Amino acid sequence: MTTQWEEYESELRAGDADRVNAVVDEIREMDIIERTEAFEGCFGGATDLYRSHEDGYVRQSCVRVVQQFAPRLPAAVTLQSSDVASPPAETVHDQTDAVCGFLLEAITDEDGRVRQSAKRALKDCIRAYDALEETATIEGLIEELETMAAGASGKQAQHLREAKEDAEFFMQSGLGRIIEGFQKEFGDALDS
């Protein structure tokens, strides 16, 4: 009998967009508890496949799958409600930390598609940390991304700086976020 990860792995190794998207969609449709439980059997396999595969699309697919397994904002929010089933807080923290650590590796990948996927996925981790009120963790992440960007060049440095800016955004007050988001969305239109 094949495990859930073995099924996913064969789809990811195929490098076919439709098959990869089906895996991503299947994980996305899991409820929080299912996803948290599946994480244990799939995270290590996805990160191992990422590290061992030469094909950038397969590595990007691994990042996308890991992003779906991340506890993310809904898990952090359900921790604050006794009316909704949620995984243990320690599990949410541990899994978010594991995903974030992997994404810091993936955001330095030689393939720009992989870096872009990792940058998007990092936003989910940052949102979860924000909901968990883990400001020290976000501050540490900002420092790490700054250090990584200083040691990188070209597009890789740009992607690291952009990820750092995303993290800095979450350190602002709620009003500051609204204003900055508004400026990013409509800034050029306001200047005319």
Predicted features along the sequence, with ranges:
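Eukaryotic acidic, Ser/Thr-rich intrinsically disordered low-complexity regions
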Residues: 4, 149-192
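Alpha-solenoid helical repeat architecture
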Residues: 12-15, 50-54, 106-110, 149
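Structural signature of alpha-helical solenoid repeat scaffolds
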Residues: 25-29, 67-71, 123-127, 165
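Buried hydrophobic core positions in alpha-solenoid tandem helical repeats
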Residues: 8-9, 42-48, 88, 102-104, ...
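N-terminal "cap/leader" segments of large eukaryotic alpha-helical scaffolds
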Residues: 1-25, 182-190
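Positions within the helices of HEAT/ARM-like alpha-solenoid repeats
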Residues: 18-22, 54-59, 113-115, 152-160
